[in-house]
Amino acid sequence: MEVNDLGFIATILFVLVPTVFLLILYIQTREETES
């Protein structure tokens, strides 16, 4: 299965961006409930 660099980067960003976004939301809400 051949994957060009642009498609590979796009796939990584497509997975990474929502994951980071959810992590930030999770950490923020957890800090609010702890304090």
From Swiss-Prot:
Subcellular locations according to the entry: Cellular thylakoid membrane
Transmembrane annotation, as ranges: 7-27
Entry's Gene Ontology cellular component terms: photosystem II; plasma membrane-derived thylakoid membrane
Pfam families per UniProt: PsbM
Bilayer topology: Single-pass membrane protein
Keywords: Membrane, Photosynthesis, Photosystem II, Reaction center, Thylakoid, Transmembrane, Transmembrane helix
Main location (coarse class): membrane
GO biological process: photosynthesis, light reaction
Complexes and interactors: PSII is composed of 1 copy each of membrane proteins PsbA, PsbB, PsbC, PsbD, PsbE, PsbF, PsbH, PsbI, PsbJ, PsbK, PsbL, PsbM, PsbT, PsbX, PsbY, PsbZ, Psb30/Ycf12, peripheral proteins PsbO, CyanoQ (PsbQ), PsbU, PsbV and a large number of cofactors. It forms dimeric complexes.
Xref: PANTHER family: PHOTOSYSTEM II REACTION CENTER PROTEIN M (PTHR35774:SF1)
Similarity field: Belongs to the PsbM family.
The protein's role, per its UniProt record: One of the components of the core complex of photosystem II (PSII). PSII is a light-driven water:plastoquinone oxidoreductase that uses light energy to abstract electrons from H(2)O, generating O(2) and a proton gradient subsequently used for ATP formation. It consists of a core antenna complex that captures photons, and an electron transfer chain that converts photonic excitation into a charge separation. This subunit is found at the monomer-monomer interface.
Protein name: Photosystem II reaction center protein M
